[in-house]
Amino acid sequence: MKWKKSLAGLSSYKPGKREEEVMAELGLTKITKLSSNENPLGTSPKVAALQANSNVETEIYPDGWASSLRKEVTNFYQLEEEELIFTAGVDELIELLTRVLLDTTKNTVMATPTFVQYRQNALIEGAEVREIPLLTDGAHDLEGMLNAIDEKTTIVWICNPNNPTGNYIDLADIQAFLDKVPSDILVVLDEAYIEYVTPQPKKHEKLIRTYKNLIITRTFSKIYGLASARVGYGIADKEIINQLNIVRPPFNTTSIGQKLAIEAIKDQAFIEACRISNANGIKQYEAFAKRFEQVKLYPANGNFVLIDLGIEARTIFSYLEKNGYITRSGAALGFPTAVRITIGKEEENSAVIALLEKLL
């Protein structure tokens, strides 16, 4: 086969082991998964009720325009329908962005470490990837990113809060950054975890009308608890949306996914409860870190914590796994002595912290 040359050296995404597989290997009767930043509280009761009574006609193609969901999200953010695009998770939106803007003659600028799919999709298109190391506290080096831009740059990526560190860039700094980026370069503001930020930042979706080169990406996979439904979306100027729709598959979000997302966004009381629970979980880990001088906890603003224990990451990961908790080894994330742990329920956080204390 005459494969694209850009695929040479790349590998496919390898998901972690299934919980059942880990239990069988280690002889455990229970496992708690804290590796994928899923919502430990599940999803809204309204979503659960719809799931129990769903009558989706699976033989019928879904609404390719996601009309009902589009209206719901439009009303929620006070936007226009043409300022939205819906995709099979933010992963698909990232793929579409790289497809329309990157090729072998272009480059893209991003932080490192950050969400791996920016780099992966850029390399698939054959583009040069310019990675700017995070600052020592895990924050984006925005000045360094600006300096990396040249006439061949077409996309700049900002993950906010950043995955895997959890650092959050406030709105004033985002706007100051946008003011300095040339207007013909797209800035992707990936806000997959924005609903977890406490206190919540003021509404800023309409920044897309001031900065025509901005797209804000969000998802129903995290705080809304719909990871398996695969519904993400982008908010941008109509011209950006028009270009993306040219390459968007016609039926890329499912009927059930659209319906579940509608119910999820309606229940903001559940979202607030999740945000409070998550903030309390972060406080548990902050208190733990204060008790041990050698422990470094990165600023947590998502639904996860990145903890550097000064111990080889695989050792920490294996130790927690053997005790029934699946986490994410920092070795694969650019942090060789750290682990990333999803914030769980209060008792789950306490159990993990107790194990870490024993390890130290």
From Swiss-Prot:
Provide the alphabetized UniProt keywords.
Amino-acid biosynthesis, Aminotransferase, Histidine biosynthesis, Pyridoxal phosphate, Transferase
Pathway stated in the Swiss-Prot or TrEMBL entry: Amino-acid biosynthesis; L-histidine biosynthesis; L-histidine from 5-phospho-alpha-D-ribose 1-diphosphate: step 7/9
Q: Which SUPFAM superfamilies match?
A: PLP-dependent transferases
EC annotation from Swiss-Prot or TrEMBL: 2.6.1.9
Q: Which CDD domains match?
A: AAT_like
Reaction(s) the record says it catalyses: L-histidinol phosphate + 2-oxoglutarate = 3-(imidazol-4-yl)-2-oxopropyl phosphate + L-glutamate
Q: Which InterPro entries match?
A: Aminotransferase_I/II_large, HisP_aminotrans, HistidinolP_aminotransfase, PyrdxlP-dep_Trfase, PyrdxlP-dep_Trfase_major, PyrdxlP-dep_Trfase_small
Q: How does it assemble?
A: Homodimer.
Protein family (similarity comment): Belongs to the class-II pyridoxal-phosphate-dependent aminotransferase family. Histidinol-phosphate aminotransferase subfamily.
Q: Please identify the protein, giving its name as recorded.
A: Histidinol-phosphate aminotransferase
Taxonomic source organism: Listeria monocytogenes serovar 1/2a (strain ATCC BAA-679 / EGD-e)
